[in-house]
């Protein structure tokens, strides 16, 4: 089935699956009305229909005729306080399993898109969302506290973006995960190495010991070295000096030992590709444990990392992830998982319908959803 239509995309999330996962996770134990599948549908529906979620917005949509038609829930009404309580206490694992299933299932729908090298890339990065410290007793403190009013605390979530779709999600709520050296490393290791996969991450994770661990685990990676990178040249890997590609002039491609803590050499080989931006002369250093690719492809693959920055901007602006609707860690995880599932649906629609921007894809997706309701629930013509 070509997933160009909203109805075709939603049909890929069958009711049978939602019920089955509900039984396996026990998300509906002791609950008769606000069941897992219904909350999942409410969150997706609300994310598509509103640019600023809140518990009162969820209440409005839940009690609307449009959502009743979308979900098939009947005429049951509820209050925002009941929805907030349910999000705080229902099992987030239900949504985690829906996310894992969606990642694998919809990846098949995009398997023929883009080149082979692009499809091998799994980018990892983190972003932060703020919430008032007066509302919660957890969160990461960043920077100096304000002179007046409560401080903001941060939630960090780290995403893997494989090919065009999110592949993993890790949420961090506590201060010891403020450093990417810990959060990003843990997220990458938790995802597990995949055959032929190229893991891409930025300077936030630069521990030489971690790079060595990744290499020993069989995890292929490409990252960027800092401007003050210190290394010991061992041997030239390939002669590339003077070659140019994609706006870069290449200087060297060699095997090196890296310095640890600025003064001690770690005797573990890494690949260093050094290039210069032709436009402004800025030096770039790419570090990797991948030896088969050309230096040009090493630099090209690292550029694919920018896709995850675009993705974060999309989910924050269009799916309003930056506005957290629940004060519990559990409720926030549910919001994040459902946001990424919604992003998967929109990405599949965007790619298969050849739409350039996420903003337009979301608008068109919502329009087609409303047209589908009108078509299916239009009054019958008198005979």
Residue ranges and their predicted role:
Residues 104-111:
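A short, well-structured juxtamembrane/interface segment
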Residues 79, 123-124:
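Noncatalytic, basic helical substrate-engagement surface that gates or grips nucleic-acid strands
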Residues 64-69:
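A broadly used, surface-exposed interaction patch
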Residues 70-92:
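Major-groove recognition helix of helix-turn-helix-like DNA-binding domains
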Residues 1-56, 61, 88-90, 94-102, ...:
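Single, function-defining residue in the core of a domain
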């Amino acid at each position: 089935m070509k997933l160009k239509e909203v109805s075709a995309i939603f049909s890929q999330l069958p009711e049978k699956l939602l019920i089955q996962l509900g039984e396996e996770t026990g998300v509906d134990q002791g609950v008769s009305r606000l069941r897992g599948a219904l909350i999942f549908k409410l969150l997706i529906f609300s994310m598509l229909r509103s640019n600023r979620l809140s518990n009162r917005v969820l209440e409005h949509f839940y009690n609307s005729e449009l959502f009743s038609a979308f979900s098939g829930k009947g005429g049951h009404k509820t209050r925002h306080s009941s929805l907030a309580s349910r999000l705080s206490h229902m099992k987030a694992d239900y949504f985690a399993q829906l996310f894992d299933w969606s990642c694998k299932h919809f990846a098949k729908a995009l398997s023929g898109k883009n080149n082979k090298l692009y499809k091998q890339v799994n980018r990892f990065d983190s972003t932060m969302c703020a919430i008032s410290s007066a509302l919660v007793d957890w969160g990461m403190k960043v920077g100096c506290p304000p002179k007046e009013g409560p401080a903001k605390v941060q939630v960090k979530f780290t995403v893997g973006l494989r090919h065009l779709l999110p592949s993993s999600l890790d949420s961090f709520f506590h201060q010891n995960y403020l450093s990417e050296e810990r959060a990003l490393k843990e997220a990458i290791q938790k995802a597990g190495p995949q055959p032929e996969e190229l893991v891409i991450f930025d300077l936030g994770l630069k521990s030489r010991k971690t790079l060595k661990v990744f290499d020993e685990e069989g995890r292929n990676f490409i990252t960027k070295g800092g401007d003050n990178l210190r290394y010991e040249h061992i041997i030239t890997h390939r002669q590339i000096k003077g070659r140019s590609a994609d706006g870069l002039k290449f200087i060297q491609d060699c095997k090196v030992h890296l310095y640890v803590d600025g003064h001690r050499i770690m005797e573990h080989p890494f690949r260093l590709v050094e290039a210069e931006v032709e436009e402004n002369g800025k030096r770039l250093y790419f570090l990797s444990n991948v030896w088969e690719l050309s230096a040009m492809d090493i630099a090209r693959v690292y550029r694919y990392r920018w896709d995850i920055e675009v993705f974060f901007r999309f989910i924050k602006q269009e799916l309003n992830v930056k506005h957290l609707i629940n004060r519990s860690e559990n409720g926030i995880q549910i919001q994040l998982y459902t946001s990424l599932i919604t992003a998967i649906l929109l990405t599949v629609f965007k790619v298969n319908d050849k739409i350039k921007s996420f903003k337009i894809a979301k608008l068109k997706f919502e329009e087609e959803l409303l047209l589908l309701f009108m078509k299916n629930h239009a009054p019958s013509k008198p005979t």
